[in-house]
Amino acid sequence: MRHSPSWSALRARLQHPLIQAPMAGVQDSTLAVAVSRAGALGSLPAAMLDAAALERELHTLQRELGLQGLPYNVNFFCHRPPEVDAQREAAWRQALAPYRTQWGLGSEAAPAPVRQPFQAALADVLAQHPPPVVSFHFGLPSAPLLDRVKGWGSLVMSSATTVEEALWLQAHGADVVIAQGLEAGGHRGHFLRADHDLEGQLPVSALLAQLQAAVSLPIVAAGGLGHASAVSAALQSGAAAVQVGTAFLLCEEARTPAVHRQALMRAAPVCEAVPAEAATAL
């Protein structure tokens, strides 16, 4: 297992080498607080929060965790938002209109929440309440923004789905690499290839082994680790910790909708999941 001074300091504050994956839309600070109080690392997804909402959540985390010396993670995206094509938007709305009428959903779909990349306005808020850990998805922010985050003492983590991405993260200032295997239910974190080809994506066990041979940073295993045996195997294979998301969806502190809770409770213990190009999160 690899260690860095910043990771070793964080690990010493955790009872369990377990990170709750940030899951935008199905959780807020309530779940993060519960996880950190239980001895693992709770995470707050911030990609869908504006500056005011982020400040409220950071106040909660500082009050409920920071003042007690408990660590927590705040997660941001580093993607480039797509440009909206008004004609294509109108075309797909028109194509789906008959189905919305058939199922009594109304004529217009509600606009989806916008996931914003990490930017200066959010960094200004974060600087007032520096979290122990800041994690990123889809790479890292610009060098000036990353320097600000590291300057106030936060440990920086980011996801890699390939060796190439892990090497890039190591070269550009990450303290910890999250090895996101193909089994992961969240957004695919790939960021170096424009085509987002899934053929080169590996299961977490294979990816963990490749990253251990290629980079010197601590590596967190992520993807399909929903059982104690899988967690144990990842740790025995050298992972510094594991990151788990789906397994937390049935917690009472999660905001998982009732229909999704029912589906999870009805699901078979083992089922096949097939990644798709059109959507990268379950």
PLM feature spans:
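Conserved active-site-proximal phosphate/metal-binding subdomains
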Residues: A97-Y99, H187-V220, L225-L282
